[in-house]
Amino acid sequence: MAPMPPAANRPDDATGPAVAVAGTASGLGTRVLAALRADPDLGRVIDLDTVVDPVAARAGLGPDDTLIHLGDPGVELGPDGLPELDPSDLRKGLEASPSVGHLVVLSAAMAYGAWPTNPVPLTEETPLHPDPSFAYAARRAEVERLVGEWRLDRPDVGAAVLRPAVTVAAESVAWLALSPWSARALRASGADRPSQFLHLDDLAAAIDHARIHRLDGAYNVAPDSWLSRDALADLAGPVGRVHLPPSWVARVRDLRGRLGVPGGRAGEAYVEHAWVVANDRLRATGWEPRLRNEEVYVEADPGGPLADMSPRRRQEISLAVAGLGLVGLVVDAVALIRRRARG
């Protein structure tokens, strides 16, 4: 018997349910499509970002089919490494899919908010309470509200909402280095926020798992446990991490953001307060993370030029670099002000 062709190339009358995916341009989208195309039980895999008529494709989804909404078209990533997601685009997509039988939507652990009173870890029973001034987290909470609203008239439709932790992989090296989650990022003295790092492969597997088992409800997606500040510093290798007073850190991040430097602003509270999540509920359905926090971070942060230096020398260089960085930011700010004044 000839092997079954890839799902994306199977004819329209192929047997088995169809799966339509929105937001496939990112590394996550590539992984999800690969998993779907490897499933011989699927009839069709529809890439809504590239199909000629996505509205018609959505309208053709039936009770046995699944819609997976990963994010917006394009490769722009949010501050947690997930694809950006516009709630208005999701609303339009849901309205165009009136008969679909199952939905998988990507939210984020950031939707819980980062508060001094957060339990460690956060579970799905914790209400979503993002800081409304941090637009990214507020959008994720709005996404979940839209899914709940859409389901009111569809009690028989299952909807899995996944809330991943910070998500990275080997291709995330540059992104992580510029993010506030790197061990090399500025930290306020005394801050000891725990960290979680989920691998893109494990998130893609969780999405496919939710599709296969037609999960319903909210599920955190994260590795087992989390990393303390000291554990993260150890994993990053011999790096010189500078600790500054909280007011200095806030000013530097604010200035970086105003100058358009990546990673300048990621929601101040998320950098200072705990928002790690428990994965027990998803694990109970049969999903397991393949990689631990430690393995994920090391893959995405292979180390830098300080790796072979002594701790004392690393600290001396780090302090010097931090000072130069502050001076450089001030110089950039002055130059920016002068350019605007001349304009």
PLM region descriptions:
Residues 16-38:
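N-terminal Rossmann NAD(P)H-binding glycine-rich loop of SDR-like oxidoreductase domains
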Residues 51-96, 114:
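NAD(P)H-binding glycine-rich loop region in Rossmannoid oxidoreductase-like domains
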Residues 3, 292-343:
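Amphipathic terminal alpha-helices
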Residues 150-196:
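NAD(P)-dependent short-chain dehydrogenase/reductase
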Residues 131-160:
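Active-site Tyr-X1-5-Lys
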Residues 91-135:
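Conserved Rossmann-fold NAD(P)-dependent oxidoreductase catalytic core, especially the SDR/UDP-sugar
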Residues 259-289:
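Conserved C-terminal active-site "lid" loop/helix of NAD(P)H-dependent oxidoreductases
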Residues 206-266, 301, 307-315, 337-342:
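Mid/C-terminal beta-alpha module of Rossmann-like enzyme folds, strongest
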